[in-house]
From Swiss-Prot:
Cellular compartments annotated: Cytoplasm
One annotated Gene Ontology cellular component of this protein: cytoplasm
Native species: Trichormus variabilis (strain ATCC 29413 / PCC 7937)
Keyword Ligase annotated: yes
Function: Plays an important role in the de novo pathway of purine nucleotide biosynthesis. Catalyzes the first committed step in the biosynthesis of AMP from IMP.
Pfam families: Adenylsucc_synt (PF00709)
Originating gene: purA
GO molecular function: adenylosuccinate synthase activity; GTP binding; magnesium ion binding
Protein's recorded name: Adenylosuccinate synthetase
GO biological process: 'de novo' AMP biosynthetic process; IMP metabolic process
Length: 447
């Protein structure tokens, strides 16, 4: 039995969907613990592409129980569309469970999110406009609507009468938008409630029961460490906690019950939206990575900014999340390059900095210090073992592992399940030893 968290070690879009899908083969339960429809994951199975925003990746395995935890915010309209899409493809959704205490994104959340971003002008933060931030804001202000409220028509109508009255003041007076009709919103969301009712349970209790029965549980995060509300590049962050610690809060699980943490990083770095990005590449090289990596957002379709691998944020993600091992994705995107650069440290105002600065203003002044490695310039997408990789690619992976001081357990070389090298068992492998008895760093790349 193992309880494993999968987290993004960069700014999201690292390939967590594929890695979670792979690991779901060994999982009895897959749980999504934070975020909402502002994140998406793409899974390719036997040439068929699935794009999901709320439903956990494990839904493609018929015997795997999938849960949406209390730390997520749920847009019922999107969730029902995903259910309908899967069922139209004869994929069963009967094993999907939804936390009754998860908060619900309402129409006024989306309207306020978009209007607020437009009002920011040059100070925009790059929101997806899906209402995620305002939903979490209402949760913090204790005025939010939870899934269990949808199940009680009288309670929903009473709560929305007060809430929409207040939200209409904001929509009309601040943003010059038309008001919402309370009864129309109530009717719409009661319809959603009936469709979702069979899936709604106390997921925290279900998770605890699965642990008692010694089931393998996989906790799936959305976005990435550098988008974490507390530990990311604030204010250019999301409104929840994608880091490993968020899995406990977002599911109702005690921290002593977590066995392993697996981080996912691309072999280079990408970012969507606003905010500092020290290794960002402009010009032809950035375009090459974007084209070869198909770097367009699953949720918004926005073009992702591309850059070299940043080991400074990599080490930070290892530390913040207590990672036991890493999965490196999209190694094949680098196949054509003659040289590859890796950021090993920053220079800030003439001084070397080996650690991630907590100030976004200071981070914006960081200039990357690079180490240049030779490329391999041969295709790797058909490699299935470490021995199949060209030596330069293997050297590159070893260098990343040394810089981040964590083993690499999985190497992904394409979108399909079979385009993967499993270096060590990421679920049942050993806990990471920080140091050997003699004080030297622990094993870096298992082989």
């Amino acid at each position: 039995m193992a309880n494993v968290i999968v987290i993004g070690a960069q700014w999201g879009d690292e390939g967590k969907g594929k890695i979670t899908d792979l690991l779901s083969r060994s999982a009895d339960v897959v749980v999504r613990y934070q975020g909402g429809v502002n994140a998406g994951h793409t899974i390719v199975v036997k040439g068929q592409t699935f794009k999901l925003h709320l439903i956990p990746s494990g839904i493609l395995y018929p015997d795997t129980e999938c849960m949406i935890g209390c730390g997520t915010v749920i847009d019922p309209q999107v969730l029902i569309k995903e259910l309908d899409q899967l069922e139209s493809l004869n994929i069963s959704t009967k094993n999907l469970l939804i936390s009754e205490t998860a908060h619900v994104t309402m129409p006024y959340h989306r309207l306020i999110d978009k209007a607020s971003e437009e009002r920011r002008g040059s100070h925009k933060i790059g929101t997806t406009g899906r209402g995620i931030g305002p939903t979490y804001a209402d949760k913090s202000e204790r005025t939010g609507i939870r899934v269990l409220d949808l199940m009680d028509p009288a309670a929903l109508r009473d709560q929305l009468a007060w809430t929409i009255n207040n939200k209409n003041l904001i929509l009309e007076k601040l943003y010059n938008l038309p008001p919402l009709d309370t009864e129309e919103v109530v009717k719409e969301y009661l319809g959603y409630a009936e469709r979702l009712r069979p899936h709604v349970v106390d997921t925290s209790l279900k998770i605890y029961d699965a642990i008692q029965r010694r089931r393998n549980i996989l906790f799936e995060g959305a976005q990435g460490t550098l988008l974490d509300l507390d530990h990311g590049t604030y204010p250019y962050v999301t409104s929840s906690n994608p880091v490993a610690g968020g899995a406990c809060v977002g599911t109702g699980l005690g921290p002593t019950m977590i066995d392993r943490v697996i981080g996912v990083s691309k072999a280079y770095t990408t970012r969507v939206g606003e905010g500092p990005f020290p290794t960002e590449l402009d010009g032809e090289l950035g375009e090459l990575l974007c084209d070869r990596g198909a770097e367009f957002g699953t949720t918004t379709g926005r073009k992702r900014r591309c850059g070299w691998f940043d080991a400074v944020i990599g080490r930070y993600a290892v530390r913040i999340n207590g990672m036991d091992c890493m999965a490196i994705t999209k190694l094949d995107v680098l196949d054509e390059l003659e040289e590859i650069q890796v950021c090993i440290a920053y220079e800030i105002d003439g001084d070397r900095c080996d650690h991630f600065p907590t100030s976004a203003r200071q981070f914006a002044r960081c200039r990357p210090i690079y180490k240049t490695l030779p490329g391999w310039q041969v295709p790797t997408s058909e490699c299935r073992t470490l021995e199949d990789l060209p030596q330069q690619a293997l050297d590159y992976l070893k260098f990343l592992a040394e810089l981040m001081e964590v083993p690499i357990a999985i190497v992904s070389l394409g979108a399909s399940r079979d385009q993967t090298i499993i270096v060590e068992d990421p679920i049942h492998g050993p806990k990471r030893a920080l140091l050997h008895p003699d004080g030297t760093p622990a094993s870096l790349l298992s082989a």
